[in-house]
């Protein structure tokens, strides 16, 4: 009996011992297959060799220091050789946390389509557009990207030309957990009409951004007095959707002219996060200082937009659970016909559960401004609050919650609101309430009027707000 039990035990032991290594071998085989599919990149020469297999899968096996001015997969016309270059990367590159160091140029990849970039760190980049391609921009990783995916990308260094920190032009791309630490100091280029920079990417109406951060300081300076556009954004220009993104860098535009005219059909936009969204802006915030200066001129038709989160109004855009904690300011002159809009959070087709605690400061010599603690032009504004100081010196309207308001309810203001000047008006809730107003159940603690001005005296259609002794939040 004992021998039978021993035989059974030995058989079971043999099965266990033979099956376990087989499983381990299968796992090792899987890793071997993966390694065979992905090509290791260990040098600058290996990066260049990627152009021989555009749809390959690659990974960084070590840190790489770039010694030359690389621009892989170019797509441009060389006027010297009269050759049209059309190349595009369509594969994948996994940095595996390794670094690409000291890149200098217009963009490591010129063109990418349906490609995947992940876990890449680029340090000490120096971005500048060459004169022959001045009409284009610059970016650290990709110049032109179409239907690409970018995740866990971090770039640090500096930029001297218009462009973006990580990717310049995009079409239907997705960005997740990307971080820019690029400090950009952009000087106006007179031969191009648009001078701009975005921390992550320029973006488009089909691109999405999630959990991205800009930590770089971006400054654009110029002396424009003709048709021109100055734009600086912490994350992106245009997006389809943006969620849980944060800007902590300082965003600055300075325009100074010497001939007595500060801007003719001239536009300046500075924003902590994005210019425009075709969909939702959710859970985004700004803690950086946002500042625009347009001075030393005597006449202007300059259009000014300055905000902490989003710059442009779009009816399809909903802004939810966003905040501004940084100082937002404008100094100088703006347009009479196209007023300046300055606010803590910004604009949107609707805005809910947003707040501002930063200082909103406007000092104008000429032109009209609408200044709001939370929203520049309030439509469908609900459950928002302002606790920051809102001050206007010059001509225009300043409101604790909104500079201009047409529909808003259940909002409150505890911040101080002031307007100084012959034609300056302040309201604890709104600077100005429009004719189509549906404004009710708003509250404030200040001693001023609920609004600086309203376009109708017909009592049933006046905005409704209530002064209270205190608000707990």
Predicted regions mapped to residue ranges:
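Hydrophobic core
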Residues: 11-15, 19
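Signal peptide cleavage region of secreted peptide precursors
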Residues: 22-23
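Sec-dependent signal peptide recognition
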Residues: 4-9
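A periodicity- and composition-biased signal for non-globular, repetitive helical segments
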Residues: 10-11, 473
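Surface-exposed repetitive/solenoidal architectures
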Residues: 29-473
């Amino acid at each position: 009996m004992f021998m039978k039990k021993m035989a059974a035990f030995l058989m079971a032991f043999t099965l266990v011992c033979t099956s376990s290594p087989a499983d381990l071998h299968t796992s090792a085989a899987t890793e071997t297959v993966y390694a065979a599919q992905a090509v290791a990149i260990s040098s600058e020469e290996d990066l260049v060799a990627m152009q021989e297999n555009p749809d390959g899968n690659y990974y960084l096996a070590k840190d790489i220091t770039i010694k030359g001015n690389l621009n892989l997969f170019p797509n441009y016309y060389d006027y010297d050789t009269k050759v049209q270059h059309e190349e595009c990367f369509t594969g994948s590159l996994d940095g595996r946390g390794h670094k690409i160091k000291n890149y200098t140029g217009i963009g490591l990849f010129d063109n990418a389509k349906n490609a995947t970039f992940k876990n890449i760190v680029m340090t000490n980049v120096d971005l500048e557009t060459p004169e022959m391609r001045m009409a284009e921009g610059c970016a650290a990783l990709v110049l032109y990207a179409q239907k690409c995916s970018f995740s866990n990308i971090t770039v640090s260094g500096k930029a001297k030309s218009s462009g973006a920190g990580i990717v310049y032009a995009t079409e239907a791309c997705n960005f997740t957990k990307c971080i820019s630490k690029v400090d950009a100091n952009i000087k106006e280029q007179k031969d191009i009409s648009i001078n701009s920079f975005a921390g992550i990417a320029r973006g488009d109406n089909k691109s999405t951004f999630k959990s991205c951060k800009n930590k770089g300081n971006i400054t654009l300076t110029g002396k424009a007095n003709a048709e021109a556009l100055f734009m600086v954004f912490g994350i992106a220009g245009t997006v389809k959707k943006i969620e849980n993104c944060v800007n902590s860098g300082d965003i600055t535009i300075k325009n100074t002219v010497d001939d007595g005219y500060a801007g003719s059909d001239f536009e300046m936009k500075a924003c902590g996060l994005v210019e425009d969204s075709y969909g939702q802006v959710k859970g985004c915030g700004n803690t950086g200082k946002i500042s625009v200066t347009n001075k030393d001129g005597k006449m202007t038709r300059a259009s000014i937009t300055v905000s902490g989160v989003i710059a442009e109004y779009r009816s399809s855009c909903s802004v939810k659970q966003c905040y501004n904690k940084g100082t937002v300011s404008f100094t100088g002159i703006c347009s009479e016909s196209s007023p300046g809009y300055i606010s803590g959070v910004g604009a949107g087709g609707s805005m809910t559960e947003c707040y501002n605690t930063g200082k909103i400061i406007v000092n104008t010599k000429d032109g009209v401004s609408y200044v709001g603690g939370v929203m520049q032009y309030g439509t469908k504004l609900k459950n928002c609050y302002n606790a920051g100081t809102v001050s206007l010196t010059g001509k225009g309207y300043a409101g604790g919650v909104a500079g201009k308001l047409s529909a808003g309810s259940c909002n409150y203001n505890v911040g101080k609101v002031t307007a100084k000047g012959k034609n300056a008006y302040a309201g604890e809730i709104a600077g100005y309430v429009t004719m189509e107003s549906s404004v009710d159940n708003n509250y404030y603690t200040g001693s001023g009027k609920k609004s600086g001005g309203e376009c109708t005296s017909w009592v049933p259609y006046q905005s409704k707000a209530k002064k209270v002794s205190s608000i707990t939040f």
